[in-house]
């Protein structure tokens, strides 16, 4: 029947943010199962700490009253971290401070910003998005700025500098959502500007480039699938990337140029066993229909791809990557201390330039994850390369050792 909606809210969460989502699942005639599923989905919202609801008969025949008690989660968080994850040629040791707020204007809008620094890198990253419908469709803006200088001993005398700016608009729309399954579509437009110089003079290190400048406009269309159960999560993502001649793109008549196509596919899973062991898998593929500008290529090597190698050991148009990791808890609370073992491998090839030699990387190794205190985490990984590469460096990263220390505080 009809229904009335009343709130008992123990926070300043705006009524309309929750009301619009509740109205999406409380259409007449009221279905209690649909309502329960909708409330369970709301519980997954990072803005909500707890939500309780009670459906009671109303004072008028045929009407029901839904009493909702809501406690808002802390929306503001600050994180500081240090690690050695960056490429060695700009300084692998990195410090980062990041800030995020999940409800800036009270509309469920999200803002995040971070600043990172190494010996040769300054990086700024800003992102803002806003929900536009009860299905959590969002529009957003993002801006990235990386200003780097080669600091390796053999090359720092040449004063090689590079600056890349990316300004993008995005639209992300879930089209089907249940507790178990989500389907989402996304559309992004990125405008990317790159500037490079050698000894203070504009210089082209790769194409497309004119007088040390590369301007790209990239349209990206993504499709995402997520399936979750209490002990398993599967996620897949497909992204089509189109380089288009728009917004002052750099136009050259040789390849690679401003017009290109590539596809990026990603599949990930997490499986929790009865003894709280975790098995994680990642499988990525990038296939390019054309030679790609270097800032659109796929890199292998480093903490996020193949451990045991320096970051960006191989950079190619096309790539395949696979990773399996087992996490074994050593404490009663499985999140406090974990030992990890992993095996990873990847291969890459180009559409125009010669393929790298070697073109394939593989690594095995061990790691440790330690929740030292509330918000303070330490991570250590050691990867052993299975394929030899020409590498004379002696940094921790080039020896297959990666570390990070992070502290996060919510307010």
Name each region found by the language model.
Residues 1-86, 98, 114-123, 263, ...:
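Periplasmic polypeptide-binding modules associated with outer-membrane biogenesis and secretion
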Residues 53, 76-86, 97-103, 107-119, ...:
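Transmembrane beta-strand segments that form the barrel wall of outer-membrane beta-barrel proteins
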Residues 62, 91-95, 120-124, 163-167, ...:
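Residues that define the transmembrane beta-barrel architecture of outer-membrane proteins
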Residues 73-75, 104-106, 133-135, 176-180, ...:
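Outer-membrane beta-barrel channels and translocator barrels
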Residues 78-80, 109-113, 137-141, 183-187, ...:
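Transmembrane beta-strands of outer-membrane beta-barrel proteins
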Residues 99, 370, 375, 397-411:
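Outer-membrane beta-barrel "beta-signal"
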Residues 138-290, 348-349:
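Transmembrane beta-strand segments of outer-membrane beta-barrel domains in Gram-negative
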Residues 149-152, 188, 192-209, 218, ...:
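Outer membrane beta-barrel transmembrane domains
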